[in-house]
């Protein structure tokens, strides 16, 4: 590991393509130039902050600078210099962006602690907080939220803390136990732990790449925002504000197949379509894979990924790619267990079967359930949902909600286009009759045309 610190800038530069190295050299020349435009051979923290301006929080600029400055140069006369040389600059960027897990771990370790002595978990936590905040900041600053506007001007602190906790939850200590919360903050972290963390948590390296590519405006062609943040297709004239923010979108997108990460199409929203189960059914059926998200009245945000189109029928549907998730107060995903195939359920207008939308578990005991009596649901898990091994997702086992969204993922395939253009009430007379008998209002009555049957 000691050798990694003294690898020459020339060797590190070989990890970049010639045109990339030229861009790295150009940025160094800008940073190291005096006010008169003369290159000095090194640059200071003040010069770096002046160049970055408002693109990154000052704390992250300082961490990047410290990481560069702590790379041991081959020229020992520069070892005590408090500025950054070309060799250190190139070596840091090369190892951080293109290095092995060991090399990336070393650069991250250099960025984490600025004090002598052992690095503790609280130092890693503070670094992770700065990293997550920097990603949210720079994507906002560079106007690369791709349509995911926040309900407030900034990403909510609760969302940032949930992302930080999720990243730290994958950190494993020498005794094999994972990070469990505040009681672990005084545990010592060695470089091997950081290397393993960087290896097992791809978001760490991904977020550092965003900070470098967008914060320093370096090697921008190497970073495609669509791989991180899907495009939000919800053109509602500025009226729509999603339950999700950019960090929760990044988290959920990372658990999807590549073809589902490019763009998300808003299919249904209570904000736009009202509290209507028939509206929900008519908007989400035959739309391909989708993501449904709810926020209960206690502020818990959770939902599920449906791997195929929803169909109104009294049988379970879907496959083992489906999963449940929570976003607030904590971020987590819950995959299939193999215990049963109760992945997805959508039914309406049946007198002998449950009417509503469900995922996981069994009839009347779903891991996630949205009742046809819209605005009510349950999440039952004692001790866990049999299908997804998920805990109770909502604050209360039986919950009330006002906010729900369903997103279609990727482009709508031809096999789904043209299907199910009718409302579920048009195609299911029994459902229509049952609704009228129960005295429930038909919110869409008079607001739409009933489509004609296709030949």
Curated annotation (Swiss-Prot):
Subcellular localization(s) per the UniProt record: Membrane; Cytoplasm; Lysosome
Region of interest called Disordered, as start-end residue ranges on this chain: 435-455
Domain of life: Eukaryota
PROSITE patterns: TLDC
GO biological process, one term: TOR signaling
Lipidation (N-myristoyl glycine): 2
Classification via InterPro entries: TLDc_dom
Pfam families per the UniProt record, alphabetical: TLD
GO CC term (a single one): nucleoplasm
Function text: Activates an alternative mTOR signaling through RPS6KB2 activation and EIF4EBP1 repression to regulate cell proliferation and migration. Recruits MTOR at the lysosome, essential for MTOR signaling at the lysosome.
Record-linked PANTHER family: MTOR-ASSOCIATED PROTEIN MEAK7, NUCLEOLAR PROTEIN 7/ESTROGEN RECEPTOR COACTIVATOR-RELATED
Subunit text: Interacts (via C-terminal domain) with MTOR and MLST8; the interaction with MTOR increases upon nutrient stimulation.
Name of protein: MTOR-associated protein MEAK7
Species this protein is from: Mus musculus (Mouse)
Lineage start: Eukaryota, Metazoa, Chordata, Craniata, Vertebrata
